Amino acid sequence: MASSSSTLPLHMYIRPLIIEDLKQILNLESQGFPPNERASEEIISFRLINCPELCSGLFIREIEGKEVKKETLIGHIMGTKIPHEYITIESMGKLQVESSNHIGIHSVVIKPEYQKKNLATLLLTDYIQKLSNQEIGNKIVLIAHEPLIPFYERVGFKIIAENTNVAKDKNFAEQKWIDMERELIKEEYDN
């Protein structure tokens, strides 16, 4: 049986997301999240403009000769610096607190046809390593549904508690959300 890595797309790379990626980001959000959990165009634009260093995309390049013909976004992570030690309804909006040491991840998504190939692990590990080395903050926090907890634990996140703040919002009250965190330690990725 062939391993999933043998079917990885060619010419993959990770780079910071920019405002010119907005259309592809919106498309990916619509494929990865139910309508009530998607970030709006306004919020995504805010994040791309105010904290692009916290927004990473996994792309496939279509190359002809030495020329790049097209870049296709197949995964992304979007975050902001948040004022609390956990995700709140407020922090999921248009909020970036530059002086904060807490980075809130608001979305991790891989295009459906590229799932189950460890690409989310690749993207998230790269994200954690970059933030650790750049000393942008000292902790990453996120909220997750219970089925995703083992995935986040594999890349070093720990369960903190059930998030009761987001449950107060009608868009998020239908399911249980779990607060998770991961320390950013520069020495962890030193060579």
From Swiss-Prot:
One of its GO terms (biological process) is chromatin organization. It comes from the Eukaryota. One of its GO terms (molecular function) is diamine N-acetyltransferase activity. SUPFAM superfamilies: Acyl-CoA N-acyltransferases (Nat) (SSF55729). GO terms for cellular component: cytoplasm. PANTHER family: SEROTONIN N-ACETYLTRANSFERASE. Acetylates spermine and probably also other polyamines such as putrescine or spermidine. May regulate the levels of polyamines on chromosomal DNA, which would modify chromatin structure and affect transcription or replication. Also able to acetylate arylalkylamines such as tryptamine and serotonin in vitro. This is Polyamine N-acetyltransferase 1. It comes from Saccharomyces cerevisiae (strain ATCC 204508 / S288c).
